[in-house]
Amino acid sequence: MPVVTTDAESETGIPKSLSNEPPSETMEEIEHTCPQPRLTLTAPAPFADETNCQCQAPHEKLTIAQARLGTPADRPVRVYADGIFDLFHSGHARALMQAKTLFPNSYLLVGVCSDDLTHKFKGFTVMNEAERYEALRHCRYVDEVIRDAPWTLTPEFLEKHKIDFVAHDDIPYSSAGSDDVYKHIKEAGMFVPTQRTEGISTSDIITRIVRDYDVYARRNLQRGYTAKELNVSFINEKRYRFQNQVDKMKEKVKNVEERSKEFVNRVEEKSHDLIQKWEEKSREFIGNFLELFGPDGAWKQMFQERSSRMLQALSPKQSPVSSPTRSRSPSRSPSPTFSWLPLKTSPPSSPKAASASISSMSEGDEDEK
């Protein structure tokens, strides 16, 4: 593994080039005892001042190409990332994830600046330094947390923590009288860029809170915080509490409206179902009625059958013309049928003439007999 030559150091004390001379035998015999990357996530990451690293092996510098090819298991690539990490959010976590996955075998050290340095160079923070330290310890990508990290990285700090590379976004970070606090790191070939996550930052979160300050103040008053704790005046406190009562009434009215709408919808659904069932029953009833009492219904057919039976029972059958009884008595002739012809008679002129005509008619009858 190449070692650093003393003649290739820049003015800042950071080595700029690497020699290809093989290490001496004494250097190979000494094993690395530096902390290894965390294999389990059941405990938070340790602080740098608690690890007590006593590794005596010389820390040989690596190029980015060598680090990407991979290193021995006992020689992880030590990557450093620093920041304020106020209101730790997903953008911070993604940046640390990128720093952790830059190389196959990496050990991620995260430096967190103290409150004094942050308030001096950047401004007031929402979380204090202890809270920010703890937030970083519980990030799964972090192997070690360095408290009170320097604002500008010095050669002594890099050598103390045996840092191979520094990971940060490539945007120049002007602060502390410098156009870019990572300029000397970039010149030394130790800078590895990461990508920022758009749409999320600590400043954006604070802007949301300030924009909706009244909403959050009312919410916290409702949850039991006092006006003194929220730094709210007496008048604003009463206004917020009154607004909370108004919102409660609005919520109740809204709930009643929603319930009434649900009730109306249920009634409409049930009435619709009821109407459908009633229509089905009506169609069934009408169909059954037509089948029974319609023009070709069963009732009419039954009435016709009964009527025909009654007619057959009431009217006897006529005997045929050539019946046996008529053939047995051939001598008997049917009685003659007489047709009375109309006679024109003049009215009798006298009672005697009328009696004479009647007597003549009776005599004629006796002669026929």
Swiss-Prot record:
The keyword Lipid biosynthesis applies. GO terms for biological process: CDP-choline pathway; ovarian follicle development; phosphatidylcholine biosynthetic process; spermatogenesis. Pathway: Phospholipid metabolism; phosphatidylcholine biosynthesis; phosphatidylcholine from phosphocholine: step 1/2. Phosphocholine binds at residues 122, 151. It catalyses: phosphocholine + CTP + H(+) = CDP-choline + diphosphate. The modification Phosphoserine is found at residues 315, 319, 322-323, 329, 331, 335, 346, 349-350, 355, 360, 362. Residues 319-339, 351-362 have a biased composition (Low complexity). The keyword Metal-binding does not apply. Pfam families: CTP_transf_like. It comes from the Eukaryota. The modification Phosphothreonine is found at residue 345. CTP binds at residues 84-85, 92, 122, 168-169, 173, 195-197, 200. One of its GO terms (molecular function) is identical protein binding. SUPFAM superfamilies: Nucleotidylyl transferase. Gene3D superfamilies: HUPs (3.40.50.620). Its EC number is 2.7.7.15. Residues 1-27, 309-369 are annotated as: Disordered. One of its GO terms (cellular component) is cytoplasm. Keywords: Cytoplasm, Endoplasmic reticulum, Lipid biosynthesis, Lipid metabolism, Nucleotidyltransferase, Phospholipid biosynthesis, Phospholipid metabolism, Phosphoprotein, Transferase. Homodimer. PANTHER family: CHOLINE-PHOSPHATE CYTIDYLYLTRANSFERASE B, CYTIDYLYLTRANSFERASE. Belongs to the cytidylyltransferase family. This is Choline-phosphate cytidylyltransferase B. It comes from Homo sapiens.
